[in-house]
Protein backbone atom coordinates (compact mmCIF):
# COMPACT_ATOMS: atom_id res chain seq x y z
CA UNK A 1 0.00 0.00 0.00
CA UNK A 2 1.23 3.46 -0.85
CA UNK A 3 1.92 6.07 1.80
CA UNK A 4 0.30 8.51 2.07
CA UNK A 5 -2.91 7.21 0.57
CA UNK A 6 -4.82 9.19 -2.04
CA UNK A 7 -7.83 9.35 0.28
CA UNK A 8 -5.80 11.04 3.03
CA UNK A 9 -4.22 13.44 0.55
CA UNK A 10 -7.59 14.47 -0.85
CA UNK A 11 -8.57 15.60 2.65
CA UNK A 12 -5.77 18.19 2.39
CA UNK A 13 -6.27 19.27 -1.26
CA UNK A 14 -9.75 18.73 -2.63
CA UNK A 15 -9.09 17.84 -6.28
CA UNK A 16 -6.81 15.24 -7.82
CA UNK A 17 -5.69 17.70 -10.48
CA UNK A 18 -4.62 20.28 -7.90
CA UNK A 19 -2.93 17.61 -5.81
CA UNK A 20 -0.87 16.37 -8.75
CA UNK A 21 0.02 19.92 -9.80
CA UNK A 22 1.21 20.95 -6.33
CA UNK A 23 3.19 17.74 -5.83
CA UNK A 24 4.83 17.99 -9.26
CA UNK A 25 5.84 21.63 -8.78
CA UNK A 26 7.28 20.93 -5.34
CA UNK A 27 9.11 17.84 -6.60
CA UNK A 28 10.61 19.81 -9.48
CA UNK A 29 11.73 22.57 -7.09
CA UNK A 30 13.33 20.03 -4.74
CA UNK A 31 15.16 18.42 -7.65
CA UNK A 32 16.46 21.61 -9.26
CA UNK A 33 17.42 23.41 -6.05
CA UNK A 34 18.84 20.38 -4.20
CA UNK A 35 16.30 21.12 -1.47
CA UNK A 36 16.45 18.60 1.38
CA UNK A 37 12.81 19.19 2.34
CA UNK A 38 10.96 20.49 5.37
CA UNK A 39 10.35 17.22 7.22
CA UNK A 40 12.99 15.67 9.49
CA UNK A 41 12.75 12.33 7.66
CA UNK A 42 10.96 10.83 4.68
CA UNK A 43 9.78 7.32 3.86
CA UNK A 44 10.21 7.93 0.13
CA UNK A 45 13.49 8.37 -1.69
CA UNK A 46 11.88 10.04 -4.70
CA UNK A 47 11.01 13.72 -4.97
CA UNK A 48 7.34 13.21 -5.79
CA UNK A 49 6.94 10.89 -2.80
CA UNK A 50 8.61 13.47 -0.56
CA UNK A 51 6.28 16.18 -1.88
CA UNK A 52 3.24 14.00 -1.16
CA UNK A 53 4.51 13.35 2.37
CA UNK A 54 4.86 17.12 2.90
CA UNK A 55 1.27 17.63 1.74
CA UNK A 56 0.09 14.88 4.09
CA UNK A 57 1.99 16.48 7.00
CA UNK A 58 0.37 19.85 6.29
CA UNK A 59 3.69 21.53 5.46
CA UNK A 60 2.72 22.12 1.84
CA UNK A 61 -0.64 23.67 1.01
CA UNK A 62 -2.41 24.98 -2.06
CA UNK A 63 -2.87 28.75 -2.17
CA UNK A 64 -5.88 29.93 -4.11
CA UNK A 65 -5.14 33.29 -5.75
CA UNK A 66 -8.66 33.87 -7.09
CA UNK A 67 -10.29 37.14 -6.05
Curated annotation (Swiss-Prot):
Catalytic activities: RNA(n) + a ribonucleoside 5'-triphosphate = RNA(n+1) + diphosphate
A GO MF term: DNA binding
Gene Ontology cellular-component annotations: DNA-directed RNA polymerase complex
Domain of life the protein comes from: Bacteria
EC number(s) per entry: 2.7.7.6
GO terms (BP aspect): DNA-templated transcription
Top enzyme class: transferase
Nucleotidyltransferase recorded as keyword: yes
InterPro entries found in the cross-reference section: DNA-dir_RNA_pol_omega (IPR003716), Pol_omega/Rpo6/RPB6 (IPR006110), RPB6/omega-like_sf (IPR036161)
Nucleotide-binding among keywords: no
The entry's keywords: DNA-directed RNA polymerase, Nucleotidyltransferase, Transcription, Transferase
Coiled coil: none
Family: Belongs to the RNA polymerase subunit omega family.
Biological role: Promotes RNA polymerase assembly. Latches the N- and C-terminal regions of the beta' subunit thereby facilitating its interaction with the beta and alpha subunits.
Assembly notes: The RNAP catalytic core consists of 2 alpha, 1 beta, 1 beta' and 1 omega subunit. When a sigma factor is associated with the core the holoenzyme is formed, which can initiate transcription.
NCBIfam families xrefs: rpoZ
Name of this chain's protein: DNA-directed RNA polymerase subunit omega
Species: Listeria innocua serovar 6a (strain ATCC BAA-680 / CLIP 11262)
